Amino acid sequence: MLVSGMAFSFHTHTLFCDGKADATTMARTAFEHHYTNLGFSAHAPISLETDCNLPWDEADSYVYAIRSLAQEYEPKGMKIFLGLETEYVPGIAKPDDPAYEPMQLDYRIGSVHYVTTPDEYPFTVDESEDQFALHVQDWAPDGDYRKIWKRYWCFISEMIEAGGFDIIGHFDLVKKNNIAGRWFDEENRAYTDAAFQAVDLAAEKDYIAEINTGGIARSKRGEPYPSVFILKRMQEKGIRITIGDDAHTPSHIGVYQPKAMDIAEMAGYKTLWYMDAPGVWKEVTLESVKAQLR
C-alpha cells in the first residue's frame, strides 16, 4: 500500500566530513522543508589522507551528534538515521569494512569516487575541473581517456557484486567533469554497455539506487545522477529508486528535488522508496513527495 505525505533524503553531509554546515543546521533546514525522514551520510573514514572523509577520531562524536538529533526530532515528526557514504577502492576501502560495525549504522551508501588502484596516485572523478584535468592527463599520458569510464564502471560493478551497503550512490558520477564530452563519448556503445551491465547487476542484486540532485546543485552538467538513459534502463529492470540531495550546505536541501523527480517521471518512474526504519523500505508516489515539499 502506497503512503503519502513524505519527503526525504538519505544523502546529507556536514562539517564532520566535507559539508559546509553542522548537523544541527542541516536537520533544522530539512525540518523546515517538511522532511519526514532524513539520513546523515558522512564520507566514511578510509586509509587515504583526505580533507573530505570523516576522521576516525571524530567517529564517536559523529554518532553522538546524529543520534541526539534523532531523539530531538522524532517527537516533532521527522525520523533521522545514522549512515555513512562508504567508498569502494580496491585494496583500500570497501562498504562492508568491519571497522564500521562499532558505529551501529542504520544504513550505508555505496559509492565510487576514485578510479585509481593502490599503486597509482589517488584522484577522484568529482574533483574540481582543473584538478581533474591535470590528474587525468598525467594518469593517461597516451590520451586514451576511455580509461576513465572503463575503470569507473568496472569499480561500480565490482562494488555491486561485493555488496555490504543499502543504496547505490550517484550511479554515473563519472560524467561530472565530462562537460560537452571533453574526455569521452557518453553515447558510445561501449560506454552505454558498461553502464547497462552495472544496472543489470544492481537489478539482479535488488539494490536501491538514488537519483542524486548533487549533479544539479554542484555541477555544470545541471542534471541529476544518473542520466535519463540510465534511469530508463533502471526502470525497465525494476530497480527501486530513492532520492538524495547529496547536500553539503543547507541550500541544497529539497530545492532540486522537483526537477529530479520530473526527470524520474520522464524515465517512466511513478514512485520513490524511502527508509522508514533500518532495513525497512516503503513506497510513495512522486506526486505525493512533490506535494509535501511545496
Label every PLM stretch briefly.
Residues H11, A30, R108, H170, ...:
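Conserved, mostly hydrophobic/aromatic
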Residues A59-E204, V289-R294:
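Extended substrate/RNA-proximal surfaces in nucleic-acid metabolism proteins
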Residues L38-F40, R108, I168, A209, ...:
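Hydrophobic residues within beta-strands of alpha/beta enzymes
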Residues H43, H113, L173-K176, G214, ...:
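Flexible loop residues that form catalytic
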Residues M1-P95, Y100-P102, K175-R189, F229, ...:
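An N-terminally biased module of ancient metal coordination in phosphate/nucleic-acid-related enzymes
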Residues A190-I253:
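Active-site-adjacent C-terminal substructures of enzyme catalytic domains
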Residues V255-R294:
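Mid-to-C-terminal alpha-helical segments outside catalytic/metal-binding sites
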